[in-house]
Amino acid sequence: MADKKRYEELINILDQYSYDYYVIDNPTVEDAEYDQKMQELLKIEEAHPEWVTPDSPSKRVGGEVLEGFTKVAHDTPMLSLANAFNRDDLADFDRRIRDKVGDDIAYMCELKIDGLAVSLQYENGKYKQGATRGDGTVGEDITANLRTIRSIPMKLQKDFSIEVRGEAFMPKRSFQKLNEIREEEGQMLFANPRNAAAGSLRQLDTKIAASRNLDIFLYAVADFGEMGVTTHSEGLDMLETLGLKVNKERRLCNNLEEVYAYIDEWTEKRAELAYDIDGIVLKLNDLEQQRQMGTTVKSPRWSIAYKFPAEEVPTKLLDIELNVGRTGVITPTAVLEPVRVAGTTVSRASLHNEDLITEKDIRIGDTVLIKKAGDIIPEVIKSITEERSGSEEPFHMPKNCPTCGSELVRLEEEVALRCINPKCPAQIKEGLIHFVSRNAMNIDGLGEKVIIQLFSEHLIKDVADLFFLSKEKLLELERMGEKSVTNLLASIEASKQNSLEKLLFGLGIRHVGAKAAKSLAVHFETMDNLKMADKETLTSINDIGEKMADSIVTYFANEEVHDLLEELKRAGVNMTYTGPKLEDMSEEELVFAGKTVVLTGKLEKLTRNDAKALIESLGGNVSGSVSKKTDVVVAGSDAGSKLAKAEELAIPIWSEEDLIEYLPDEGGLN
């Protein structure tokens, strides 16, 4: 018969084993001994469920199924960091620091872990709550999922009541193993460890979170001053004495030269780490100096994140494929030997056009250097010509469309070759994908794969056919069950009520982007009015130039377009502008009337396009750069140089929450 004393002893023993293994990377027992003691603990808990506490090691394995994630307000905001992209940015940061607090300074430099920012609350030394960063003010409660991370102690070495901040992440090995399993099971692969970590921590089934082998590094306390330390470096040391996992690769630097040396070292060595990093974080070490520097609305003035330049990696160019876009443009795509770049495996990359391939002398069979532009889109930079064997083949663009066989043409003043056959299947398919996309008709459940399936099965030949799809036909398709078909048809039905600009953009009229579609919809109000417009009328509208006007007139002169619009009308698709008209709005409603607004950083609740549409609906004009002519900057998380420039120019800065206050009452934008 087990007694409670033995139960408590087992908890302490297992906690120590976990600390040795997961925090200080110095295992003191074999796995078999750990497992044996865990089994003993589980048997006691089965016999005495009333003894089980939230900090029991058994809670690490998950098992709790959550109903959802509640909101958590951060007592102290979790601010994001301004970014530096080069030494000039760092020198500007250093100058601002010295101008304010003098030259007696030091920087604590830390690796910027590429994961998910989280907050952990301890009460009297016991783990109480864990939350995501969210928008910095309000996050989500992920207490149960964070409990499954073995390197997070359930009890601190001292009975402190503190809130610590850190970065939860998925180690490279765990990521690779997870994607191998998902591939075997036919599931979609995660793009990178950061996405995998974020997805894992938002699982409602804590067993899934526990199986993902996440880890964490802690790097701050909500208020280090509460711990009786005077510097950030002392604070990190204190976290370690409490049993929390802090990254060992930090370094105290006394000047910028030492900072540069640290950055150079880890730029070279980052690939050797067991986890992904995407930069280096500098923090003014003295806490009193931090207080003097203060913070902006979004970020501390005493810290900055240096972002690594895009990683460049060599690999083999196996082939060049040609893709036909919705406007007939032929785009060459590099087929590559799979290689890991900036946290993801890349097997395809953009080659842009034939002229660029010729200019760079890129040949099939070459070893090429690739990078991710902005760490997002892979592209081929150049061929490594010194590695050629002589077997490489120069690339020649074909004279005919790879899909329909029509002769390709190069229009005046254009670099790209085009297929101008309006019945080209590839163009129709791409046009359908564009029509249902988020910025166009925004039909949930109609992704690229479903569109291709519908097109291949001859269920749709143009966009109007989407609105006449039947439940019976959809249920015959592979992987289309009752629930998904019902949801899809409901989404198609709902899209019929979209405002005119969504439909106009979705139709894919050449040269007409989302902004021009909005201008046309506001001006003409109905599709019938727009159809009758001549070039002179069109060019009198802001955003509509001669080339676009010609394209619009040509489009509506086409009899096939008339037939398509009649079919859309028959389906009940709205062809009227239903959004706000500026002349009908009061001065109070037109908060951005005549103003230039810049969006920067990552938005948490609005998409970039929704934010842009909201600003325009309030009378504003959205610009891509900050200048003296900018009236307002809306800053999300990780806002970089644009935010810094706005502060220097004393331009008013809005948060995302400030902008959301002006959303329509129904909470959405047409």
Swiss-Prot record:
PROSITE patterns: BRCT, DNA_LIGASE_N2
Binding site for Zn(2+): C401, C404, C419, C424
Enzyme type, top EC level: ligase
UniProt-listed InterPro entries: BRCT_dom, BRCT_dom_sf, DisA/LigA_HHH, DNA_ligase, DNA_ligase_CS, DNAligase_adenylation, DNAligase_N, Hlx-hairpin-Hlx_DNA-bd_motif
Residues annotated to bind NAD(+): D31, A32, E33, Y34, D35, S80, L81, E110, R133, E167, K283, K307
EC nos: 6.5.1.2
Domain BRCT: 587-670
Described function: DNA ligase that catalyzes the formation of phosphodiester linkages between 5'-phosphoryl and 3'-hydroxyl groups in double-stranded DNA using NAD as a coenzyme and as the energy source for the reaction. It is essential for DNA replication and repair of damaged DNA.
Name assigned to this protein: DNA ligase
Organism: Listeria welshimeri serovar 6b (strain ATCC 35897 / DSM 20650 / CCUG 15529 / CIP 8149 / NCTC 11857 / SLCC 5334 / V8)
Organism lineage: Bacteria, Bacillati, Bacillota, Bacilli, Bacillales
Encoding gene, per UniProt annotation: ligA
